[in-house]
């Protein structure tokens, strides 16, 4: 996409999976119009052990994957640089350096997304970052 194409960019539960999250943020900001808004809902999933399902309901989303698959997911996750970052502090610092300002952050979004412990429940606390691209 050309520079400054979009008014809003929204991402949910994606950033933590990217091999180069800073590069993705840079690209998102490039295609965002000056004054445009970036909304990112994510979590510090890298800090959690996916193979530990003790706190999850019996019918959680990953129940059918099995222990081997969950261990493989854990090994892949450990290879992602973002898994070692302190988030969302890293996100805010990175976005600030790339030209995002006027931040708001919501650390309580999980309680509104996961209102009950059902098959979609995830105990990792989500965060929501909203920021505006500098108007230049």
Model-based region annotation:
Residues 1-3:
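Short conserved loop adjoining the S-adenosyl-L-methionine
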Residues 37-69:
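Conserved class I S-adenosyl-L-methionine
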Residues 13-14:
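Short catalytic micro-motifs in class I SAM-dependent methyltransferases
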Residues 10:
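A conserved beta-strand element that flanks and buttresses the S-adenosyl-L-methionine
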Residues 82-99, 105-106:
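Short alpha-helix
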Residues 22-37:
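A short glycine-rich, Lys/Arg-flanked "PGG" loop and its adjoining helix->strand segment in the class I
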Residues 98-100, 115-136:
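Core SAM-dependent methyltransferase catalytic element
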């Amino acid at each position: 996409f050309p520079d400054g194409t979009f008014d809003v960019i929204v991402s949910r539960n994606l950033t933590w999976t990217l091999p180069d999250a800073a590069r993705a943020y840079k690209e998102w900001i490039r295609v965002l119009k000056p004054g445009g808004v970036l909304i990112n809902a994510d979590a510090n999933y890298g800090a959690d052990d996916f193979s530990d399902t003790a706190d999850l309901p019996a019918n959680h989303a990953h129940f059918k994957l099995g222990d081997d698959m969950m261990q493989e997911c854990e090994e892949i996750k450990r290879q992602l640089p973002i898994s070692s970052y302190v988030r969302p502090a890293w996100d805010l610092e990175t976005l600030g350096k790339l030209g995002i300002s006027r931040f708001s952050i919501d650390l309580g979004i999980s309680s509104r997304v996961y209102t009950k412990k059902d098959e979609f429940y995830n105990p990792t606390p989500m965060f929501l970052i909203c920021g505006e691209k500098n108007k230049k």
